[in-house]
């Protein structure tokens, strides 16, 4: 790692329980400042969620690493991301798997994320402007689904787009939110509460 700030961040993540070396390497390789406004760049390697406009945020690096680690990704895992946002989480995923599918309900965020990913020579991502509650059915089923905004309850449509043996990680709740891991075992879904979190809400529909 040639970026001392990234190196310090990765050390912080490891000390705080992130064990997957490939996830840590991906975090180190993605320049978080590229996904922030000029005014926020000085905080790029702090472990904080930061505003990206449109009432949305870029998640804190610990949460990005934790959610990614929980998915137990393999190189050939087919991944769906709900909520492209800045594209930072998308970029981390793209370094770990062959292809990422990502849905964003706010058109301007989708286009900004596409531009940033292209600038970083990340081309193994397909993005779509649409309603995240609906997933991306014609590209599924998926081995892993990651939701980057909090739903009041688990969207049943997303469960149906999960492969047998697949994993989904998402925040659930309104005022008090929990990070939930769900694993599909044939027609059953086994869920586990991971920890308390704080995300922006997952809103149905899409915006121009």
From Swiss-Prot:
InterPro entries: PCMT (IPR000682), SAM-dependent_MTases_sf (IPR029063). It catalyses: [protein]-L-isoaspartate + S-adenosyl-L-methionine = [protein]-L-isoaspartate alpha-methyl ester + S-adenosyl-L-homocysteine. GO terms for cellular component: cytoplasm. Gene3D superfamilies: Vaccinia Virus protein VP39. Coiled coil: none annotated. It comes from the Bacteria. One of its GO terms (molecular function) is protein-L-isoaspartate (D-aspartate) O-methyltransferase activity. Its EC number is 2.1.1.77. Keywords: Cytoplasm, Methyltransferase, S-adenosyl-L-methionine, Transferase. The active site is at residue 59. One of its GO terms (biological process) is protein repair. It is found in: Cytoplasm. The keyword Chloroplast does not apply. Catalyzes the methyl esterification of L-isoaspartyl residues in peptides and proteins that result from spontaneous decomposition of normal L-aspartyl and L-asparaginyl residues. It plays a role in the repair and/or degradation of damaged proteins. Belongs to the methyltransferase superfamily. L-isoaspartyl/D-aspartyl protein methyltransferase family. HAMAP family: PIMT. This is Protein-L-isoaspartate O-methyltransferase. It comes from Vibrio vulnificus (strain YJ016). The lineage of its organism: Bacteria, Pseudomonadati, Pseudomonadota, Gammaproteobacteria, Vibrionales. The gene is pcm.
């Amino acid at each position: 790692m040639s970026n001392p700030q990234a190196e310090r961040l990765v050390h912080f993540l490891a000390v705080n329980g992130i064990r997957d070396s490939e996830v840590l390497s991906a975090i180190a390789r993605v320049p978080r400042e590229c996904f922030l406004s000029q005014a926020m760049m000085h905080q790029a390697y702090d472990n904080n969620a930061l505003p990206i406009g449109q009432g949305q945020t870029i998640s804190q690096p610990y949460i990005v690493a934790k959610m990614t680690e929980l998915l137990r990704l393999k190189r050939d895992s087919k991944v769906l991301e709900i909520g492209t946002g800045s594209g930072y989480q998308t970029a981390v995923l793209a370094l770990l798997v062959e292809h990422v599918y990502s849905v964003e309900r706010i058109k301007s965020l989708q286009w900004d994320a596409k531009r940033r990913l292209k600038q970083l020579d990340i081309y193994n991502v397909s993005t779509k402007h649409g309603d995240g509650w609906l997933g991306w059915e014609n590209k599924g089923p998926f081995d892993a689904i990651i939701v980057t905004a909090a739903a009041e309850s688990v969207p049943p449509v997303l469960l149906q787009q999960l492969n047998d043996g697949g994993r989904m990680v998402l925040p659930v709740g309104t005022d008090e939110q929990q990070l939930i891991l769900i694993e599909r075992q044939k027609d059953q879904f086994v869920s586990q509460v991971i920890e308390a979190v704080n995300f922006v809400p997952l809103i149905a529909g899409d915006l121009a």
